[in-house]
Swiss-Prot record:
Residues 66-85 are annotated as: Disordered. GO terms for cellular component: cytosol. One of its GO terms (biological process) is ribosomal small subunit assembly. Keywords: Cytoplasm, Ribosome biogenesis. Belongs to the RimP family. This is Ribosome maturation factor RimP. The gene is rimP. Required for maturation of 30S ribosomal subunits. It holds the Pfam family DUF150_C. It is found in: Cytoplasm.
Length: 163
């Protein structure tokens, strides 16, 4: 579906999400015919705490009510799917990085280097991470000095679940 069809949907969904104190991460109608799904991804606007399922369920009901009232989705019926980014997410914006401070991130640089590090700070154009090194299995883990990583030097980055 083209972006001009998404605009009325977003215009209905975004104020509902904002009124709930959340950030609209994504709003996309996928599929065709009878198998269409409106996927809405919501998150907390800032902070590092997790978005609870009860809060997602509450905003999902409010979104559903607004969509029924405004009817911005043309064509056949669709299924509404509202979720949060979850424990592992792609880090694409400074806000994503700020939401992940304190957690592990897996980074792949433009040069092809891959590593996992703890995210210590997140700024508008860079992050500060701390890698660790374990020389041999069973030996203590050594924390390396914090290092600056410019977002422009990163090909991909994801938050990681800790063991």
């Amino acid at each position: 579906m083209s972006s001009e069809h998404h605009a009325p949907i977003r215009a209905t969904v975004e104020p509902v999400v904002a009124a709930a104190g959340l950030h609209l991460e994504e709003c996309e109608l996928k599929g065709q015919g009878a198998t269409r799904t409106l996927q809405v991804l919501v998150d907390l606007p800032d902070g590092t705490e997790a978005l609870g399922l009860d809060r997602v369920a509450a905003v999902a009901q409010e979104i559903s009510d607004a969509l029924d009232r405004d009817d911005p989705v043309p064509g056949p019926p669709y299924e509404l799917e509202v979720s949060s980014p979850g424990a592992t997410r792609t880090l694409e914006t400074p806000r994503h990085w700020r939401r992940t401070v304190g957690h592990l991130v897996r980074i792949r640089t433009l040069e092809g280097e891959r590593y996992t590090a703890r995210l210590l700070e997140a700024h508008e154009d860079h992050a500060v991470v701390q890698r660790s090194h374990q020389p041999k299995k069973g030996m203590p883990v050594k924390l390396l000095d914090p290092e600056r990583v410019d977002y422009a030097s990163i090909r991909t980055a994801r938050s990681e679940v800790e063991n």
